[in-house]
C-alpha cells in the first residue's frame, strides 16, 4: 500500500498558483455568459434607441423653443 500512497501524494502536488474547485467551473461559465450578454444588450440598446437623448438630437430637443420664448 505504500507505493500507492506515494503516487497519490505526487499527483496532489500542483505547480499552479490558484486552486479552483471543479464545482465552480459552471458558476464561472454562467457568470461570464451573463456579463457578456448584459454588455451586448446594453450596448445594443444605447446604440439603436432613438428616444434616448445621449447625444445632441435636434428633433427631440425643445431647448430652441424655450430659448426663443426667453428672448421675447
UniProtKB/Swiss-Prot annotation:
Protein name, as recorded: UPF0495 protein YPR010C-A
Gene Ontology cellular-component annotations: cytosol; membrane
Subcellular localization, as worded in the UniProt entry: Cytoplasm; Membrane
Transmembrane intervals: 20-42
InterPro entries from the UniProt entry: B12D (IPR010530)
Similarity-based family: Belongs to the UPF0495 family.
Organism in which the protein naturally occurs: Saccharomyces cerevisiae (strain ATCC 204508 / S288c)
Keywords: Cytoplasm, Membrane, Transmembrane, Transmembrane helix
Lineage of the species this protein comes from: Eukaryota, Fungi, Dikarya, Ascomycota, Saccharomycotina
Membrane topology classification: Single-pass membrane protein
Entry's Gene Ontology BP terms: negative regulation of protein-containing complex assembly
